[in-house]
C-alpha cells in the first residue's frame, strides 16, 4: 500500500521526478515533461496508438465521438490483471489541451473506474497529472496484491508517456 513515492532517475532533479501518492485504488501520479501543452495533449489523445505502447493497454478502439466526448474500448493485460485480458468501455470528455476525464461505462472485473489527466504549463514544460479511482472486482485476499501491482504500473505508465512526449 503506497502512501507517497518519488522516483527519480540518475541525474534527475526533484522538479523532474515522478511522484505517486494515494492507496487502495485512489491515486495521483505526476511527472514534469519539458514539452509544450500541445505536444503533451497530442500524445495523450492518441488513444488507439497507445495499444502496445503503454504497459497495460493491449487493445484500444474509439467506438464513437461526438464533439469533445468519446467512447473508448480498451483491453488491459498486465501483472495487476493477473495475466487476464480485461475489457472496459470508457466515456472520455476532452477539454483540449488541458484536461481529459474518463469514467467506466462497463467493464469486466471492474466495479468502478474514473479519473482524469491534467496538463498544467510550468516553467520549462508541463506537469502531467493522472488521478485515478478504481475498485476492482477481485477476491479480498488478492486486493493488496492488485493494488501493489497497479501502483507499479502507474509509475511505469508515466515513464512511458514522458518518453513518448519527448519523441519528435
What does each model-found stretch correspond to?
Residues 1-3:
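Sec-dependent N-terminal signal peptides
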Residues 7-67, 156, 163:
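Hydrophobic ligand-binding cavity/cleft-lining segments
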Residues 26-28, 84-89, 111-116:
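Short, surface-exposed coil-to-beta transition loops
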Residues 33, 76, 132-134:
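Hydrophobic beta-strand positions in extracellular immunoglobulin-like domains
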Residues 36, 65-67, 97, 122-125:
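Short strand-connecting beta-turns/loops that link adjacent beta-strands
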Residues 61-108, 156-168:
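Glycine-rich portal/gate segments that line the openings of hydrophobic small-molecule binding cavities
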Residues 104-152, 156:
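Beta-strand/loop substructures that line and gate deep hydrophobic ligand-binding cavities in soluble
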Amino acid at each position: 500500500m503506497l502512501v507517497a513515492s518519488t522516483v527519480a532517475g540518475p541525474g534527475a532533479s526533484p522538479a523532474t521526478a515522478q511522484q505517486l501518492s494515494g492507496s487502495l485504488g485512489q491515486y495521483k501520479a505526476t511527472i514534469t515533461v519539458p514539452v509544450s501543452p500541445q505536444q503533451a495533449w497530442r500524445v495523450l489523445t492518441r488513444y488507439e496508438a497507445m495499444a502496445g505502447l503503454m504497459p497495460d493497454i493491449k487493445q484500444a478502439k474509439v467506438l464513437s465521438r461526438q464533439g469533445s466526448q468519446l467512447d473508448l474500448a480498451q483491453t488491459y493485460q498486465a501483472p495487476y490483471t493477473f495475466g487476464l485480458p480485461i475489457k472496459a468501455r470508457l466515456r472520455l470528455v476532452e477539454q483540449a489541451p488541458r484536461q481529459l476525464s474518463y469514467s467506466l461505462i462497463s467493464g469486466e472485473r471492474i466495479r468502478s473506474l474514473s479519473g482524469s489527466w491534467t496538463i498544467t504549463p510550468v516553467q520549462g514544460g508541463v506537469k502531467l497529472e493522472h488521478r485515478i479511482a478504481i475498485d476492482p472486482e477481485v477476491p479480498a485476499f488478492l486486493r493488496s496484491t492488485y493494488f501493489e501491482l497497479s501502483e507499479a504500473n502507474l509509475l511505469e505508465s508515466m515513464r512511458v508517456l514522458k518518453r513518448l512526449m519527448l519523441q519528435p
